[in-house]
């Protein structure tokens, strides 16, 4: 009798995706982040579901309902902090996953890469809407500032902002619709992740060398299932340590003050994972220019495959490109730091230089360096 997992219509899909999937024999731990992102998404959906059972999306009671979850609901504090810090873990895994794609040339799988960029936008939108829900000071002023940026769009800007707000200011209608979107988007993300995997399995995984690995494949199970379980255990260790020892480390103390439209916080800033984009936004004095730079800071990833000029796919054997890659990482860390600083000297000029360097590296320096390395191969 043939094995059920190979004949059953549903099991067959699971089998070909996670059990008998031929995988390159040399993929490193950098390939663990896809599965970790899947785990993060499951954790976020489950904790979010339990939070939604007790949360009320009304401006009068939203803040109190979050307090009620933390004080009165059984293990409500744990669910709330798992959800908040789970988002941070999600973004850490996302950034590392994208970084690995850039380093090893995984962006050459065009469909997989473009759906990944779409997923990044969707996750950022979800996280932004989720930050609004506790209805603290930073929630209120964050959503006011960021949605107001849309008014920079010529002709339709002001109408668009009022349409998103559901009125003439951020109020009950805004909170209710953001809650609705925050609830539905993770399921759309899960569907997109399925399509992401579908396209990946059409081509098979890339590997650190960037060479074709068809001649040397091993089954996904047990080799990479065990490897993924190790990654998951480490993720759980970091997340639980964060939640149980220092749950507010990555949050903003201003969000423990109920939203007050009459009192502006001294420094309005988003969560840490948006700070690099926020720094790029702030570095341009013009409103529309800032909004364009903000969108392009992520959208530039979609252009990367078309700027690949190297004869080699991976950066593994390209020392000059490696140097530029790590300069890009340092630049992003600098932007993250600048995003959390007040708008004053010397932070303004540092932010502007770091923003210019960010786009310069991706659009100009990396492609030129790749061409230079191609010529080195001829020597």
Swiss-Prot record:
Membrane-spanning ranges: 33-53, 77-98, 113-133, 178-198, 226-246, 288-308, 320-340, 347-367
Gene3D superfamilies: Cytochrome Bc1 Complex, Chain C (1.20.810.10)
Coiled coil: none
Localization per record: Mitochondrion inner membrane
InterPro entries according to UniProt: Cyt_b/b6_C, Cyt_b/b6_C_sf, Cyt_b/b6_N, Cytb/b6-like_sf, Cytochrome_b, Cytochrome_b_C_euk/bac, Cytochrome_b_N_euk/bac, Di-haem_cyt_TM
Cofactor: binding details: Binds 2 heme b groups non-covalently.
Alphabetical list of SUPFAM superfamilies matching this protein: a domain/subunit of cytochrome bc1 complex (Ubiquinol-cytochrome c reductase) (SSF81648), Transmembrane di-heme cytochromes (SSF81342)
Note: Heme 1 (or BL or b562) is low-potential and absorbs at about 562 nm, and heme 2 (or BH or b566) is high-potential and absorbs at about 566 nm.
Assembly, per entry: The cytochrome bc1 complex contains 11 subunits: 3 respiratory subunits (MT-CYB, CYC1 and UQCRFS1), 2 core proteins (UQCRC1 and UQCRC2) and 6 low-molecular weight proteins (UQCRH/QCR6, UQCRB/QCR7, UQCRQ/QCR8, UQCR10/QCR9, UQCR11/QCR10 and a cleavage product of UQCRFS1). This cytochrome bc1 complex then forms a dimer.
PANTHER family xrefs: CYTOCHROME B (PTHR19271:SF16)
Protein name (record): Cytochrome b
Species of provenance: Sorex jacksoni
């Amino acid at each position: 009798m043939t094995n059920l997992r190979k004949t059953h219509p549903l099991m067959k899909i699971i089998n070909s995706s996670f059990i008998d999937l031929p995988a390159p024999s040399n993929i490193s731990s950098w390939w663990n982040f896809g599965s970790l992102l899947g785990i993060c998404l499951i954790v976020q959906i489950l904790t979010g579901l339990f939070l939604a059972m007790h949360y009320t999306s009304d401006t009068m009671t939203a803040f109190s309902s979050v307090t009620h979850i933390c004080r009165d609901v059984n293990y409500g504090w744990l669910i709330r902090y798992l959800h908040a810090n789970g988002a941070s873990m999600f973004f850490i895994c996302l950034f590392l996953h994208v970084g690995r794609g850039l380093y090893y040339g995984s962006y050459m799988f065009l469909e997989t890469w473009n759906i990944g960029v779409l997923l990044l936008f969707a996750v950022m939108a979800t996280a932004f809407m989720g930050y609004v829900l506790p209805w603290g000071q930073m929630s209120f002023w964050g959503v006011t500032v960021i949605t107001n940026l849309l008014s920079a769009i010529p002709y339709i800007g002001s109408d668009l902002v009022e349409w998103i707000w559901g009125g003439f200011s951020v109020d009950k209608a805004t909170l209710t619709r953001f809650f609705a979107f925050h609830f539905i988007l993770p399921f759309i993300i899960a569907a997109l992740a399925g399509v992401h995997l579908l396209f990946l399995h059409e081509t098979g995984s890339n590997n650190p060398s960037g060479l074709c690995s068809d001649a040397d494949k091993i089954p996904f199970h047990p080799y990479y299932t065990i490897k993924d379980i190790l990654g998951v255990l480490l993720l759980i260790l970091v997340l639980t340590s964060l939640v149980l020892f220092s749950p507010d480390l990555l949050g903003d103390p201003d969000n423990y003050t109920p939203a007050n439209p009459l009192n502006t916080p001294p420094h309005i800033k988003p969560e840490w994972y948006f700070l690099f984009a926020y720094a790029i936004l702030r570095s341009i004095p013009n409103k529309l220019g800032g909004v364009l730079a903000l969108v392009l800071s992520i959208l530039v990833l979609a252009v990367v495959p078309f700027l690949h000029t190297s004869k080699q796919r991976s950066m593994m054997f390209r020392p000059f490109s490696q140097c530029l890659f790590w300069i890009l990482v340092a630049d992003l860390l600098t932007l993250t730091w600048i995003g959390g600083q007040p708008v004053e000297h010397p932070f303004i000029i540092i932010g502007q230089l770091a923003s210019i360097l960010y786009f310069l590296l991706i659009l100009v320096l990396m492609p030129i360096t790749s061409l230079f390395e191609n010529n080195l191969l001829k020597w």
